[in-house]
Amino acid sequence: MEVTGRLFIWAILAVSCGAQLNSTEAEGKSRCTASLGGANLGETHKALVLQLSANENCTWTIERPENRSIRIIFSYIKLDPGSRCETENIKVFDGSSTSGPLLGKACSRNDFVPVFESSSNSMTFQIVTGLTKFPRSVFIFYYFFSAATVIPNCGGDLRALEGSFSSPNYPKPHPELAYCVWHIQVGKGYKIQLKFTDLLLEMDENCKFDFIAVYDGPSTTAGLLKQLCGRGKPTLESSSDAMTVVLSTDYANSYKGFSASYTSIYIHDVNTTSLSCVSDKMRVIISKSYLPALNYNESNLQLNDPTCRPNVSNVIEFSIPLHECGTVKKIEDHAISYTNRITFIESPVSAVITRQKLLQIVVTCEMEYNSTVEIMYITEDDIIQNQSVLGKYNTSLALYESDSFENLVQESPYYVDLNQTLFVQATLHTSDPSLVVFLDTCRASPTSDFASPTYDLISSGCCQDETCKVYPLFGHYGRFQFNAFKFLKHLNSVYLKCKILICDNNDQTSRCNQGCVPRRKRDIPSYKWKTDSVIGPIRLKRDRSASRDSGLLPQIHEAEISNQPLSRLYLFSFMVLALNVVIVAITTVKHFLNRWMDHRYQKLQVY
């Protein structure tokens, strides 16, 4: 009888756990731990409305015998808006328990629609609520899917300055259980304007079922611009050069979906023209309002190579590669410059006369010390307008694990042993294949500001350290190796700074082709294409075993010996202080003993 009673109690508990998935607990703590799915292979999806009370700690597990992944979507979350994410949140775990890897967390302050995917056939999510009484509600939709199943035209990368896209099957009904992501990325200096020319999805006040989520950035964790459903033709704008659009559909009520187009808007003010140079291209921006005043339009523009066309939005942009589109490279006194020409093609009404101004824009990028200088001048009927701005070389300095220079060291700081061989590579990021990198000077310092002391590894292209080895010229890469060391009387950190020279590989008299010049027989300041790169810190491991094998062992011992007199002084001072404390203590005790003797009771004399 006792066994039967226990079974009856367990049955009541099991029923109450399952009922909580679709019922509301107005007061008190609900029993909300349950297992979902797994029993019925025909059940591929499920929608739940969870009503939660205060002070809950609920856990649900989704499982399925078939080896398929799970996608769970929290399309509507109503938690206590005044709670902190640490005390009231939703956590999703990859696996059949909360001990699995955490896929992510959501709370009332999240500015995105939480969507998570498992790596296998099980997933667990946990909801914890705070002590405040508040009507909480969460809408959850999950389904099983196979990564091998692909829906055509469902998402993609859009890189042009303008374009269009639509939901799968548009204008026919969209597919069920679709999750499509479009990443829109335009050029730097632009923002994106997205227009929905047609939109028809399942209508719902909170867009819980079929919806579009538009994010202000390159991923679904960027700020949510808007969650859309129903009908309409909204227009949205990003704050940067990236935008992400998501379409999520459930298992019922499919409509025709959406059609959208986007354009790019240049965010900077351009009165007439502007020029900028980077390591691999020149970028010319021409204001659209500048051309009508001269009776031209964008179709009249061309570069030296007329097949290279501009991108047109609210401005006209030429992105000119340094070794394409008719760009002319010039070497003069070892200085490298790149020049191209934008001309306005006239459509004359007569072969004899014209009433249009003859206009051309000449753009030049010249390499300068630690930078590039951009020069632009416009000729308009013998009138020359000059413009110039400054930029920097795009170079980097990095550590690699071996002399193959394939595996980049990602750690920062990088912990090494004394005397360990380190491999360093300087990289020039440019599209010009004829440029070559030369390591002129590489210097080490225990501090990032490279104040004294410093130690030269390479000077004037020559190794100054016995463990240093400079590799031969290799295109856009300058490489060398050396053995790790430490600075005496400093922390075990080392920073590296290298001065890099960039030359034309065809210039046989350039500094790069001279190699090591010990006595500085050339004038480095006359070379304009020069830049600095810094890396660090490199730190020694706490293991001292490498120090015993290092050639720096005598120097380390010397540093320890030099500190011994100072240690003896500290010991002597401590002994004197201790002796003074003892003397003061004895004097104090003696004083109290004397006072006690003076105040003892004495026998009175009898008269």
Swiss-Prot record:
Residues 20-568 are lumenal. SMART domains: CUB, ZP. One of its GO terms (cellular component) is membrane. Highly expressed in pancreatic acinar cells. Also expressed in epithelium of the uterus during late pregnancy but not detected in non-pregnant uterus or in a variety of other adult and fetal tissues. Its main location: membrane. Residues 276-519 form the ZP domain. Glycans are attached at N22, N57, N67, N419. Residues 590-607 are cytoplasmic. Keywords: Cell adhesion, Cell cycle, Cell division, Cytoplasmic vesicle, Disulfide bond, Glycoprotein, Membrane, Repeat, Signal, Transmembrane, Transmembrane helix. Disulfide bonds join C17-C58, C85-C107, C154-C180, C207-C229, C442-C498. InterPro entries: CUB_dom, Sperma_CUB_dom_sf, ZP-C, ZP-C_dom, ZP-N, ZP_chr, ZP_dom. GO terms for biological process: cell adhesion; cell division; female pregnancy; trypsinogen activation. It comes from the Eukaryota. Residues 1-19 form the signal peptide. The chain crosses the membrane at residues 569-589. It is found in: Zymogen granule membrane. Residues 20-146, 154-265 form the CUB domain. It is a single-pass type I membrane protein. Disruption phenotype: Mice display increased severity of secretagogue- and diet-induced pancreatitis which seems to be due to impaired activation of trypsin. Pfam families: CUB, Zona_pellucida, ZP-N. Localized to zymogen granules, where it functions in trypsinogen activation. May indirectly regulate cell motility, cell-cell and cell/extracellular matrix interactions. This is CUB and zona pellucida-like domain-containing protein 1. It comes from Mus musculus. The gene is Cuzd1.
